């Protein structure tokens, strides 16, 4: 008897499912992509228990005949390709013919479908890949696929599932990516009867961005475009002031397919040059139209990894598109920015209207670079965003519509902005630390610091608005003013955050913090870490938290940016301990809130900074390890000016004169 046997189709499909179906979000991705390939304009995704109990995809696509419905459950049966040459010019999202039979082999699947030409529809019920029921039914044009009890016959896979909120966050992320890739399709995502995501399907990408990431984010996105003989690039990227703590908000699309590509991500950052803070990443949605012959999507069953010919040329095209678009906007030069810091002023905050982005009546006007509400949506006019009062960030009392369903906007509530609170308090540091390994080492190093004597310094000057000059018994001292203030602020924040207790300051005007659906769910799951540092956020409608009081160690003017920074850090470091979280938070806050280079300090401010530095436990290094000051002794100065020389014998003594 031969040792090598041909595996049964069911077993082969279950093996394939190990690659195709990693988690419930994989099922959503494959089925929604099939719906898009079928020409659907409306797709509804309904899940229960984050997809483990139920996933139902309903579309209004072209549907399937009874014969095609049966064939669709067979391995490598597809309508997308018919010959070998088709494999090199793929324009559809699916083509392998593996997804549907793989999903059916590990679940209870029900398919209800009908074509426009067909007089009747077809109902198929399959369990573990075997068709148990087939009958003729009445059905509208389109397809409805119901997947129940996922992994029922492969229970080992369930051990690797994360929490329900985590799995739901993955589903939301997939739906968001597909919504950005296909703004012409109206997507609706419902979890346990609650609507999570809804897009209008108007075909406007910027409107889709507003529906997913929020209106404030969409208004800070700039359009990019570029093209050559091989590639055509279009999309939106965020202004340098709008960043996130990770790359998860970068969406790359090739011919409508969401992909992951490290080099193309790198080209996006290169397009910003030095405009981004180290450790921060932009929001970007970039669609790349490419000849299918130049892209090989048949690399992995998930089809998220794509090999691209002329990849270097494409990288250059993306970088150029971003840099050229940024040049068209008034990004304030450092000199003017520092000049503005001589006077204390508050930064105007973008105003959030009280209209829910989840409703389909929101439209984007390219000519005016603004959003508006369709006449068929409301009966009375709503004030233009730019005409709203910006003095206190409050919303006009006449606006009646609620930002979130079930939550009424109060004139005494501010919408928090991710804008940096005051340009004087932020620094574009090249030494920002985000690596977990480096952070661990740094925490140990900072914890082991010991107090040391610091010389008495007498300030007498400043150079280039960057370095302070002082003298002491040890000679001349040159101090890096940014590093000095960074050290002072780090020790302040480390001490204050370490003293977190129940002492809270009531906010006169509460703040609202808006997040994407996936971030909102993850923050809810990790809320205890925020509470450990004295931040108590309460859910307030869809994807929104309200902050009614802040910890006393955080200044009120730092609340908006500080809360967003802590949430970003929490999302970036999934299982971080409170100790590491506080250390990283203190490093980050001290870095961003220290004075920049080319900032002139008056005598009082300079002396006060040196006095504060003298009180630090370690005044010699900033939190990143760079030196705060250097010393030139009197002997060093005399050597440089050749004042220390060997004894000379005079020429007169030698009898020359």
Curated annotation (Swiss-Prot):
KW DNA damage (keyword) present: yes
GO molecular function: ATP binding; ATP hydrolysis activity; ATP-dependent DNA damage sensor activity; mismatched DNA binding
GO terms for biological process, alphabetical: mismatch repair
Record key words, sorted: DNA damage, DNA repair
GO CC, alphabetical: mismatch repair complex
A UniProt-annotated Pfam family: DNA_mis_repair
SMART domains assigned: DNA_mis_repair, MutL_C
Protein task: This protein is involved in the repair of mismatches in DNA. It is required for dam-dependent methyl-directed DNA mismatch repair. May act as a 'molecular matchmaker', a protein that promotes the formation of a stable complex between two or more DNA-binding proteins in an ATP-dependent manner without itself being part of a final effector complex.
Xref: PANTHER family: DNA MISMATCH REPAIR PROTEIN MLH, PMS, MUTL (PTHR10073), DNA MISMATCH REPAIR PROTEIN MLH1 (PTHR10073:SF12)
UniProt similarity note: Belongs to the DNA mismatch repair MutL/HexB family.
HAMAP family per record: DNA_mis_repair (MF_00149)
Protein's UniProt name: DNA mismatch repair protein MutL
Organism whose genome encodes this protein: Streptococcus agalactiae serotype III (strain NEM316)
Gene responsible for this protein: mutL
């Amino acid at each position: 008897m031969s040792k090598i046997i041909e595996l049964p189709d069911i077993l082969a499909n279950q093996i394939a499912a190990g690659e195709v179906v990693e988690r419930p979000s994989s099922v959503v991705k494959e089925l929604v992509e099939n719906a898009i390939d079928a020409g659907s304009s409306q797709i509804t995704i309904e899940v229960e228990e984050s997809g483990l109990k139920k996933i139902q995809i309903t579309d209004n696509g072209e549907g399937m005949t009874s014969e095609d419905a049966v064939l669709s459950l067979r391995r490598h049966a597809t309508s997308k390709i018919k010959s070998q040459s088709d494999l090199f010019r793929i324009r559809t999202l699916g083509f392998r013919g593996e997804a549907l039979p793989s999903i059916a082999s590990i679940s209870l699947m029900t398919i209800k479908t009908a074509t426009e030409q067909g007089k009747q529809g077809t109902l198929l019920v399959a369990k573990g890949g075997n068709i148990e029921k087939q009958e003729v039914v009445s059905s509208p044009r389109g397809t409805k696929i119901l997947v129940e009890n996922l992994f029922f016959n492969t229970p080992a896979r369930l051990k690797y599932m994360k929490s329900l909120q985590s799995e739901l966050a993955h589903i939301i992320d997939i739906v968001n990516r597909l919504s950005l890739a296909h703004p012409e399709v109206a997507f609706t995502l419902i979890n346990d009867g609650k609507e999570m995501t809804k897009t209008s399907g108007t075909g406007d990408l910027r409107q889709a961005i507003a529906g997913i990431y929020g209106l404030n984010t969409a208004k800070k996105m700039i359009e990019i475009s570029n093209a050559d003989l091989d590639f055509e690039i279009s999309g939106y990227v965020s202004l340098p002031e709008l960043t996130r703590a990770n790359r998860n908000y970068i969406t790359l699309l090739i011919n409508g397919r969401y992909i992951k590509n490290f080099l193309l991500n790198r080209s996006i950052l290169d397009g910003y040059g030095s405009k981004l803070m180290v450790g921060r990443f932009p929001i970007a949605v970039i669609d790349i139209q490419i000849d299918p012959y130049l892209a090989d999507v048949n690399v992995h069953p998930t089809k998220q990894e794509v090999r691209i010919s002329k990849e270097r040329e494409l990288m250059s095209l993306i970088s150029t598109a971003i840099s050229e678009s940024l040049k068209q906007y008034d990004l304030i030069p450092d000199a003017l920015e520092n000049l503005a810091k001589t006077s204390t002023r508050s930064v105007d905050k973008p105003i959030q209207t009280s209209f829910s982005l989840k409703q389909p009546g929101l439209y984007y006007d390219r000519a005016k670079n603004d959003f508006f509400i369709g006449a068929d949506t409301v009966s009375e006019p709503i004030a233009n965003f730019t005409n709203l009062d910006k003095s206190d960030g409050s919303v006009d009392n006449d606006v009646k519509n609620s930002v979130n369903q079930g939550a009424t906007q109060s004139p005494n509530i501010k919408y928090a902005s991710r804008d940096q609170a005051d340009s004087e308090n932020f620094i574009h540091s090249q030494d920002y630390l985000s690596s977990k390994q480096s952070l661990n080492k740094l925490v140990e190093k900072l914890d082991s610091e010991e107090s040391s004597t610091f010389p008495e310094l007498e300030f007498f000057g400043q150079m280039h608005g960057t370095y302070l000059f002082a003298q002491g018994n040890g000679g001349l001292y040159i101090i890096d003013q940014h590093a000095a203030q960074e050290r002072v602020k780090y020790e302040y924040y480390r001490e204050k955050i370490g003293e977190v207790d129940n002492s809270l300051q009531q906010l006169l005007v509460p703040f609202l913090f808006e997040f994407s659906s996936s971030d909102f769910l993850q923050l809810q799951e990790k809320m205890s870490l925020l509470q450990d540092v004295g931040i108590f956020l309460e859910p307030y409608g869809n994807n929104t938290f309200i902050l009614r009081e802040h910890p006393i160690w955080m200044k009120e003017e730092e609340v908006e940016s500080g809360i967003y920074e802590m949430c970003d850090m929490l999302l970036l470091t999934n299982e971080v301990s409170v100790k590491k979280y506080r250390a990283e938070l203190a490093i980050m806050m001290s870095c961003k809130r220290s004075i920049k280079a080319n900032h002139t300090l008056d005598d009082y401010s300079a002396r006060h900074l040196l006095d504060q530095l003298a009180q630090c436990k370690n005044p010699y290094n900033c939190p990143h390890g760079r030196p705060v000051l250097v010393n030139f002794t009197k002997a060093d100065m005399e050597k440089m000016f050749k004042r220390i020389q060997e004894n000379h014998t005079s020429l007169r003594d030698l009898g020359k004169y």
